Amino acid sequence: MAPYRPEFSAAEQSRIDAEFSRLARNKSVYLDHAGTTLYAENQVTAAAEQLQRNVICNPHTCRLTGDFVDQVRFKILEFFNTTAEDYHVIFTANATAALSLVAENFDFGSTGDFHFCQENHTSVLGMRERVRANGIYMLKEKEISGGELKKNGTVHKVSGKTGNSLLTFSAQCNFSGYKIPLDTIEKIQIDGLSKPGKQLWGSLGENKENTHNDYYICLDAASFVATSPLDLKKYRPDYVCLSFYKIFGYPTGVGALLVSRRGADVFQKRRFFGGGTINYAYPHAMDYQLRETFHQRYEDGTLPFLAIVGLLEGFRTLERLVPKTDEFSTMERISRHVFGLAKYLEDQLRQLQHPNGEPLVELYNKVGYQDKSRQGGIVAFNVRTESGSFVGFGEIACVAALHGILLRTGCFCNIGACQYYLNLDEDAMDTIYKRAGRICGDYFDLVDGQPTGAVRVSFGYMTTFQDVEQLLQMLRSSYLATKPLQRIQFIEEQAEQLPPLLKERVQLLRPKLLQMAIYPVKSCAAFKIELEGSWPLTDQGLRYDREWMIVDMNGMALTQKRCTELCLIRPVIKVDQLELQFGDNSHFSVPLSLEDQAADSAKCVSKVCRQPVEGLDCGDGVAQWLSENLGLEGLRLLRQSGQRNSSKDQQKLSLVNQAQFLLLNKSSVRSLQFEEPLDETVDRFRANIIIDTGSAFEELTYKALSIGGIQFQVEGPCQRCDMICINQRTGERSPETLTTISRLQKGRMRFGIYITRIPQDTKELEAKEHMTCGDVVLVE
């Protein structure tokens, strides 16, 4: 690993630090420059002084204001190494408004299509709603940048073509910092697209050929130009969209759309026009004439002239604090600086490991950090626990905030990049956004243990090496040297210091009761309670859990060791009946009421774990139904009628083998990494109480816990046998379940923990005779 080499001299760094002294005063580390960079202190002071010196008013009134605006247009063109001969500058509110302007005014002709890259800002997805294209297509990044550029090609408009197609992509992905090679622009302008992409709208089944259309490029440069030079002499997109606060930090509310001469030829003013865009418009007739000057036709209404004038100090500040050298321009030096920091951080993150050798972070990038022309100053990642489970990005945001570190979490208004880097298929997207209810900007960070977003840190010219070190130290101290419960306690104790949205996230840090599983008939399938459902408790455990069992002709309890088909009997608890189902059409019901059952039943005795159990025979009808479906003669269904106590501590038990409840941590199940669906693996362990702590095997350290205020003591781990090798949905055996647990537990067959409800001496908790899915789990 190469050592970090600073781009700026000590004197330059000192001048920069002096301009951002407020960070030190506030004990803040700012690492969200892809969201917005920071303004220098003298920058805003100089901008204010300029307003105080001059009378800057509406440009329609004051020529001085118009001169200032023209200066800024010239400076923008110079900044991108081009001139007014090649590009027009249209001021907009931001990059989003620039993209909207392109969508509204681009002339697709009769056959033109709209194409966009999957890894794009949400605003590009919004363009789909406004374009008047023949078809709309999504392209993966490789489909855009994967081809070879023809040599000596010429961009031109070929006669006979009937439409204009538009491709929009980001010069730099704001999620990962990946940069699409800019020579892709000319390639597509010359050759078109080899593949149109996935069709989202339009006439299906059409054979799209490049010969029908000319191709134009709209470059979303907002993330790219904040820290990288864009040379419009070398690369000539037809449209460039940007926001100036990304570059300067101040002012906000002003962006630009740069339109090439080629792009202007297919730009047509649509429907609306505002003040300043026309030569005249009659109120008494549908007659108007637009301005001759191109940019004036599209700058509806009064420009944000004070903000535009403030841009001059932004340019001056960059040139003052990061002066060009004989070798590199200002923006090239900034690019080198942020890339160097990102490369150092990525190198350090790769070295962070848990004591068992598992990596602390999972990084999201395409080409690594070897070439700044392909990767910018952004690092995206998620944190993993020692067992490999993901830590929710909302928790990372809380911990970072309490350490004074400002970073970004989520999908960063780039759901397509989230989909790509997190490997989310269409069903997973529906699970996250439609079924689980996540919305953009929330802290709903894990669904079934899988992340719905990531952590992003991004750098600007004022970011220091020490800032990166503080982030690394926070990760080391919080996630390598601290146990999860200690970390949660730390966050909860400091929660009042957090902003409102993160305070809400603190409430989600504690694990919750996800599901309860009642097994009315011993060794048969579960009846499940989930989605905020409640279930009553008795002094033996969950009501109706293991109250029935099937015995053979010798009176011995039948288990899945002898008959795996037992798992195919599905009990359903109804208002007054227990319905047993086998397959789609076969079912039989017995009374839920013990009194009703006792009236028509004979008493009998069986054994569970060598202990005698008093029971009631449920009759010949259900006995015959069981024998027919399971293919065994002489089966009977018994219901427990007498009290059964544990031989160990006299706790009251149903027909369970060892304890009142078996608790399972879904994170532990997830660590097995079986190919079958996670819920199928959970079913193998036949637990009553399912939680998800985010940290595998954490439950093995518990001594006591409470669920929704109900106290439990831990009896110990559940020692597993080959019963867990049976798939509870098919009855098929697969031995890898047991061997995997043995490997993870170093030869021990422990999975899940037995817990027992702690008796209460008073009746003050009578209201707590139910547990509800969603109850908070507190560990002692």
From Swiss-Prot:
Reaction catalysed by this enzyme: Mo-molybdopterin + L-cysteine + AH2 = thio-Mo-molybdopterin + L-alanine + A + H2O
Organism: Drosophila yakuba (Fruit fly)
Modification N6-(pyridoxal phosphate)lysine, positions: 246
Residues of the MOSC domain: 635-780
The UniProt record lists the keyword Glycoprotein: no
One annotated GO molecular function: lyase activity
Role: Sulfurates the molybdenum cofactor. Sulfation of molybdenum is essential for xanthine dehydrogenase (XDH) and aldehyde oxidase (ADO) enzymes in which molybdenum cofactor is liganded by 1 oxygen and 1 sulfur atom in active form.
GO terms under biological process: Mo-molybdopterin cofactor biosynthetic process; molybdopterin cofactor metabolic process
PANTHER family: MITOCHONDRIAL AMIDOXIME REDUCING COMPONENT 1, MOLYBDOPTERIN COFACTOR SULFURASE MOSC
Phosphoserine modified-residue sites: 734
Cofactor field: pyridoxal 5'-phosphate
Protein name from the UniProt record: Molybdenum cofactor sulfurase
Active site: 413
Protein EC: 2.8.1.9
Entry's family note: Belongs to the class-V pyridoxal-phosphate-dependent aminotransferase family. MOCOS subfamily.
Keywords: Molybdenum cofactor biosynthesis, Phosphoprotein, Pyridoxal phosphate, Transferase
